[in-house]
Amino acid sequence: MWFQIVVEKFLAGVGGRYSDADIDAGLAIHDSLYRGHGWFADGQERAYDHYVGWAFQVYPQLLQLMAPEDPRVKARAALDGERLADFLDDAVHLVGADGAPLVQGRSLIYRFAAAAPFWAGQFAGHTRLTPGVTRRAASGILKYFLDRGAHNADGLLTIGFHSEFPGMKQSYSGAGSPYWAAKGMMGLALPADHPVWTAVEEPLPVESGDTQRFIAAPGWQVDGTVSDGVVRIRNHGTDHANAGVRVADSPLYARLGYSTATFPDLAAESVDNAVAFADADGRLTHRTGFEFLGHFRQDGVQVGASRFTAHWIDVDPDGGPDHGSGAAGTATPGPEVLVASVTRGAVELRLVRVRNAARSRARLRIGGWPADTAAGLASEVLPVEWGGVLDDAGTWHREAPHPVGEHLAIPWIGTAGAVADGDYAAVVVLSGSGPLAEACGARFGANGRFAFADGATIDVDSVFAQLNPA
């Protein structure tokens, strides 16, 4: 869509062949994918990722630079600018203190292209971020990758995330694909006396204090912690599918959590940030096609939830294009599940309501964050004295190269036998600041309220009541 718009607009400017109808049609498609507050879906599915920033927000601003006198372009300048400013308000909360972007979605081999929308805001003058915060975000993203081996010994960008990792190649990737990262260098086209270069860098939101935010379009519940600079999202709205569709989970879209400090396990069946069920052969269910139930804040605590029919997938030989969606196949239904993420800072109380479990006789698995064992991250899943008994636990290991390390570990807790209908709960924590004091201090009190280590509390019964599931 945007490739065609930009190329045809260039041809129009140099006397080449182009079609106004093509450009109009492309702009109409672009507008049809708008989902509010600066966010676009990458197609008709619940597909939200970095393309919102480096494509849907950048190209409209480039079009303004290419054809400022075109009546069509002038007519949409204010609208496109407002959308960009709205998006940047959210995007700046998704950058870690080390400059890491949120590790979620396809085409992550484009690396520091994630900085592009921040530069676009300065080019267009449509941003509420100060020049100092803009440069902190953009230069931080660039430095994050350059410090972690993005260039090989020949000085070339390779397919990978930190260093080269060919396993990240997707069906549309080529040897030159990593050079889409060039968008992240857009700021070099701004003059040396532009405020973005002369201003003193200012702290990112996560460097100034703990952050809480809900981003409605993708259904992301954001918690950033100043103690370790990590931004986490709990995901109840994005799966690169639509409600009711039963396909395999896409590792980069359908997990319950993503962060700036972890890279998802790339296996479709995984305990990575999962609420899943294991059959007699150990196969795990998927959640794609879930229904978003809502989000609210109460006394400094965030709550988001979704429900779904857990399902096993026998993947078709040709499970579909490798553009982010989970693989298609034959689905076998399992239990009905409601999952609520009750979060404050690094700590999540994960509530799980299970129904119709008897038809599957499967074991429950509540999985935590995928942490590289050499990265200094603490990832834990801990039991709490509430709800059904969780009498089994372990850590899933992948002793093989990974986009950000060599040894991946994912803790989990669950049931040793077949799960029964009922309510279950566990504390799920990802921390980069050493001992898990926050997790150890989080517990249920005698009054039935769950208390976080800093004293914030929430009544779990009210969580279910406010979500009001049928």
Spell out what each predicted region is:
Residues G13, R35, Q64, F123, ...:
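Residue-level marker of positions within ordered structural domains that often coincide
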Residues G96-A243:
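Carbohydrate-active enzyme catalytic cores, enriched for enzymes
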Residues A267-A470:
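Extended repeat-based interaction scaffolds and adjacent low-complexity, acidic/S/T/P-biased segments
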